[in-house]
């Protein structure tokens, strides 16, 4: 079954009490007065940033073949401690934290391996050699399974305990970012055909094909409240979908280049999106209105909101004055620089 993107009441559909509360909260967040801080440590550009489930640690994955874990104080200016995770022999393209454990992190690399690390010791505890260069990775919300996508459009699902493949599937089309919904019963794949393929989990049977965009879909984010998913596309648009109806309820139009990365904040009231445009857009999910733009100096690779605070980590292709990779990421949302 194919679902056409019918747009439901595009500007500000009837709001629930909860949504009104989120809009009230917007008035309390002085985005214009907030600052970004730089975090330097990698030798080459950073491809991926991700927060742990408690919002106290941030991991960064880099072309320099390492990941790093940083202790972040949301309200402090304390000394930033970081620990290096070494072992991959190619770029660390994406990483994600165990949603139930604040110190376990999984990394996907071009060296064909997926590794599980303990962020306290910096040691690799599990490793799986897969069939191709891994570029996308995500955890099931209960922390029991990890899904990995590679450059050859193959999906592998690993059992976290044994670190062995449970499912393998090769697709005959371009598969980009992947995600479970908040229940873990639905698995979503973005594709180069402009669709989102919706599969039931664990059977991986096709439930739906959502015709989301006129160009390839690159990235996907799930609203933490489980109400929506958002899709970023090569057509420069971000679309917002009601997950129960599979209807498009909003589009965000501020970017002009293919959307590379998107993220919902912890309330689900804001969405950040980034591309090769030299700013990150933050928009109100319910009104579709852009509320702030964070200037950047390069194309962005990864944005992710903290799960507890309005802190947004972001990383891109920043160069220094000698045109070498800066190896930096930044966090926006501090009251002082």
Residue ranges: model-predicted function:
Residues 49-55, 96-102, 138-143, 179-185, ...:
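Loop/turn segments within WD40 beta-propeller blades
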Residues 301-337:
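Blade-level signature of beta-propeller repeat domains, shared across WD40, Kelch, NHL, RCC1
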